[in-house]
Protein backbone atom coordinates (compact mmCIF):
# COMPACT_ATOMS: atom_id res chain seq x y z
CA UNK A 1 0.00 0.00 0.00
CA UNK A 2 1.34 3.43 -0.98
CA UNK A 3 2.08 5.55 2.09
CA UNK A 4 3.09 9.17 2.52
CA UNK A 5 4.35 11.16 5.49
CA UNK A 6 1.78 13.78 6.42
CA UNK A 7 0.93 16.29 9.10
CA UNK A 8 -2.57 16.37 10.58
CA UNK A 9 -3.59 19.21 8.28
CA UNK A 10 -2.30 17.39 5.21
CA UNK A 11 -4.10 14.20 6.26
CA UNK A 12 -7.40 16.04 6.75
CA UNK A 13 -6.98 17.81 3.42
CA UNK A 14 -6.44 14.50 1.65
CA UNK A 15 -9.48 12.97 3.37
CA UNK A 16 -11.69 15.86 2.24
CA UNK A 17 -10.23 15.73 -1.27
CA UNK A 18 -10.91 12.02 -1.59
CA UNK A 19 -14.43 12.37 -0.16
CA UNK A 20 -15.31 15.13 -2.64
CA UNK A 21 -13.95 13.02 -5.49
CA UNK A 22 -15.70 9.83 -4.36
CA UNK A 23 -19.25 11.17 -3.92
CA UNK A 24 -20.94 14.14 -5.58
CA UNK A 25 -23.20 14.54 -2.54
CA UNK A 26 -20.27 15.66 -0.39
CA UNK A 27 -19.73 19.40 -0.08
CA UNK A 28 -17.95 21.72 2.36
CA UNK A 29 -19.18 24.95 3.91
CA UNK A 30 -17.69 27.36 6.40
CA UNK A 31 -15.97 30.68 6.97
CA UNK A 32 -12.99 31.45 4.75
CA UNK A 33 -12.52 27.88 3.52
CA UNK A 34 -12.33 28.66 -0.21
CA UNK A 35 -9.03 29.63 -1.84
CA UNK A 36 -7.21 31.69 -0.79
CA UNK A 37 -8.49 30.88 2.68
CA UNK A 38 -7.46 30.58 6.28
CA UNK A 39 -8.18 26.86 6.60
CA UNK A 40 -5.22 24.58 5.88
CA UNK A 41 -7.34 21.40 5.66
CA UNK A 42 -9.39 22.87 2.79
CA UNK A 43 -6.49 24.41 0.84
CA UNK A 44 -6.80 23.95 -2.91
CA UNK A 45 -10.21 22.28 -2.79
CA UNK A 46 -12.35 25.15 -4.08
CA UNK A 47 -9.95 25.55 -7.00
CA UNK A 48 -10.22 21.84 -7.75
CA UNK A 49 -13.96 21.28 -7.18
CA UNK A 50 -15.47 24.74 -7.58
CA UNK A 51 -17.32 27.09 -5.26
CA UNK A 52 -20.54 25.08 -5.57
CA UNK A 53 -18.93 22.35 -3.47
CA UNK A 54 -16.59 24.39 -1.28
CA UNK A 55 -18.76 27.24 -0.03
CA UNK A 56 -17.57 30.32 1.77
CA UNK A 57 -20.23 31.45 4.23
CA UNK A 58 -20.98 34.57 6.27
CA UNK A 59 -19.64 34.70 9.83
CA UNK A 60 -22.62 32.91 11.35
CA UNK A 61 -22.12 29.54 13.01
CA UNK A 62 -25.88 29.09 13.36
CA UNK A 63 -26.35 29.62 9.62
CA UNK A 64 -23.49 27.26 8.74
CA UNK A 65 -24.83 24.35 10.77
CA UNK A 66 -28.45 25.15 9.93
CA UNK A 67 -27.69 25.05 6.21
CA UNK A 68 -25.83 21.76 6.70
CA UNK A 69 -28.84 20.25 8.49
CA UNK A 70 -31.18 21.29 5.67
CA UNK A 71 -28.82 19.91 3.03
CA UNK A 72 -28.50 16.60 4.90
CA UNK A 73 -32.27 16.25 5.13
CA UNK A 74 -32.33 16.70 1.35
CA UNK A 75 -29.87 13.81 0.90
CA UNK A 76 -26.51 15.57 0.68
CA UNK A 77 -23.42 14.88 2.81
CA UNK A 78 -22.34 18.26 4.20
CA UNK A 79 -19.08 18.85 6.05
CA UNK A 80 -19.48 22.09 7.98
CA UNK A 81 -16.51 23.89 9.49
CA UNK A 82 -16.69 25.97 12.65
CA UNK A 83 -13.39 27.83 12.47
CA UNK A 84 -12.79 27.91 16.24
CA UNK A 85 -14.44 25.57 18.74
CA UNK A 86 -15.21 28.39 21.19
CA UNK A 87 -18.00 29.57 18.89
CA UNK A 88 -19.74 26.24 18.43
CA UNK A 89 -22.21 27.18 21.15
CA UNK A 90 -23.75 29.71 18.77
CA UNK A 91 -24.95 26.74 16.70
CA UNK A 92 -26.12 24.68 19.69
CA UNK A 93 -29.80 24.82 18.73
CA UNK A 94 -29.10 23.57 15.22
CA UNK A 95 -26.79 20.83 16.49
CA UNK A 96 -28.77 19.63 19.49
CA UNK A 97 -32.43 20.32 18.74
CA UNK A 98 -32.33 19.78 14.99
CA UNK A 99 -29.53 17.49 13.79
CA UNK A 100 -29.12 15.22 16.80
CA UNK A 101 -32.81 14.84 17.70
CA UNK A 102 -34.40 14.66 14.27
CA UNK A 103 -34.18 10.89 14.00
CA UNK A 104 -35.83 10.39 17.38
CA UNK A 105 -38.53 13.01 16.76
CA UNK A 106 -39.54 11.37 13.47
CA UNK A 107 -39.29 7.74 14.63
CA UNK A 108 -36.38 7.18 12.26
CA UNK A 109 -38.14 8.45 9.13
CA UNK A 110 -35.86 11.48 8.76
CA UNK A 111 -32.22 12.04 9.70
CA UNK A 112 -29.67 14.80 9.23
CA UNK A 113 -26.27 13.06 8.92
CA UNK A 114 -23.91 16.02 9.09
CA UNK A 115 -20.22 16.25 9.91
CA UNK A 116 -19.04 19.35 11.78
CA UNK A 117 -15.30 19.90 11.80
CA UNK A 118 -13.72 22.36 14.20
CA UNK A 119 -10.33 23.21 15.69
CA UNK A 120 -8.85 23.69 19.14
CA UNK A 121 -6.24 26.38 19.70
CA UNK A 122 -5.58 25.85 23.41
CA UNK A 123 -1.95 26.27 24.46
CA UNK A 124 -1.10 28.54 21.55
CA UNK A 125 -1.54 31.91 23.30
CA UNK A 126 -4.75 32.59 21.39
CA UNK A 127 -6.69 34.15 24.26
CA UNK A 128 -9.63 33.20 26.43
CA UNK A 129 -12.21 33.08 23.63
CA UNK A 130 -10.09 31.09 21.17
CA UNK A 131 -8.65 28.32 23.33
CA UNK A 132 -11.43 26.20 24.86
CA UNK A 133 -11.88 22.46 24.44
CA UNK A 134 -15.62 21.90 24.60
CA UNK A 135 -15.88 18.33 23.31
CA UNK A 136 -17.33 17.08 26.59
CA UNK A 137 -20.43 19.23 26.17
CA UNK A 138 -21.59 17.21 23.20
CA UNK A 139 -20.77 13.79 24.64
CA UNK A 140 -23.96 14.17 26.70
CA UNK A 141 -26.22 14.58 23.66
CA UNK A 142 -27.99 11.48 22.28
CA UNK A 143 -27.51 11.18 18.54
CA UNK A 144 -24.03 12.72 18.38
CA UNK A 145 -20.56 11.27 17.97
CA UNK A 146 -17.51 13.18 19.14
CA UNK A 147 -14.17 12.41 17.50
CA UNK A 148 -10.81 13.82 18.61
CA UNK A 149 -7.98 12.23 16.59
CA UNK A 150 -4.51 12.10 18.08
CA UNK A 151 -2.53 11.15 14.95
CA UNK A 152 -2.68 12.01 11.23
CA UNK A 153 -3.74 8.44 10.47
CA UNK A 154 -6.65 8.70 12.89
CA UNK A 155 -7.50 12.12 11.50
CA UNK A 156 -7.76 10.91 7.90
CA UNK A 157 -9.50 7.63 8.66
CA UNK A 158 -11.95 9.00 11.21
CA UNK A 159 -12.92 12.02 9.12
CA UNK A 160 -13.67 9.72 6.19
CA UNK A 161 -15.69 7.47 8.49
CA UNK A 162 -17.65 10.43 9.83
CA UNK A 163 -18.56 11.71 6.38
CA UNK A 164 -19.72 8.30 5.16
CA UNK A 165 -20.92 6.84 8.46
CA UNK A 166 -23.55 4.22 7.69
CA UNK A 167 -25.06 4.28 11.18
CA UNK A 168 -27.75 6.92 10.97
CA UNK A 169 -28.66 6.48 14.64
CA UNK A 170 -26.03 9.14 15.25
CA UNK A 171 -27.29 11.75 12.87
CA UNK A 172 -24.96 14.58 13.84
CA UNK A 173 -21.19 14.28 14.07
CA UNK A 174 -18.59 16.68 15.24
CA UNK A 175 -15.00 16.38 14.17
CA UNK A 176 -12.56 18.20 16.44
CA UNK A 177 -8.87 18.31 15.66
CA UNK A 178 -5.81 20.01 17.01
CA UNK A 179 -4.62 20.87 13.53
CA UNK A 180 -1.75 23.09 14.67
CA UNK A 181 0.28 20.17 15.99
CA UNK A 182 3.36 19.38 13.94
CA UNK A 183 3.25 15.58 14.36
CA UNK A 184 4.05 13.76 11.12
CA UNK A 185 3.13 10.16 10.38
CA UNK A 186 3.27 7.80 7.43
CA UNK A 187 -0.29 6.93 6.44
CA UNK A 188 -2.00 5.25 3.46
CA UNK A 189 -2.50 7.64 0.56
CA UNK A 190 -5.62 5.78 -0.57
CA UNK A 191 -9.06 6.40 0.94
CA UNK A 192 -9.78 4.33 4.05
CA UNK A 193 -12.09 4.34 7.04
CA UNK A 194 -11.53 3.49 10.67
CA UNK A 195 -14.46 1.34 11.65
CA UNK A 196 -18.03 0.88 10.47
CA UNK A 197 -19.53 2.36 12.57
CA UNK A 198 -16.84 4.79 13.66
CA UNK A 199 -14.25 3.18 15.89
CA UNK A 200 -11.89 4.70 18.41
CA UNK A 201 -8.88 4.80 16.08
CA UNK A 202 -5.48 4.27 17.68
CA UNK A 203 -5.48 6.88 20.43
CA UNK A 204 -3.02 6.16 23.26
CA UNK A 205 -4.68 5.29 26.56
CA UNK A 206 -3.32 6.23 30.00
CA UNK A 207 -4.50 5.04 33.40
Residue ranges of predicted features:
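Glycine-/acidic-rich phosphate or pyrophosphate-binding loops and their flanking alpha/beta elements
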Residues: 11-18, 156-167, 179-207
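Thiamine diphosphate
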Residues: 1-168, 172, 176
Amino acid sequence: MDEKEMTMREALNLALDQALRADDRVFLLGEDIADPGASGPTAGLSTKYGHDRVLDTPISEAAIVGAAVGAAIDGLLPVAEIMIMDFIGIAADQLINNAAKLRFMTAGRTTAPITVRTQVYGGLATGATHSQTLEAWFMHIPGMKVIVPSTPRDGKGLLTSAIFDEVRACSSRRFACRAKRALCQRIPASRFRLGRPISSGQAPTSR
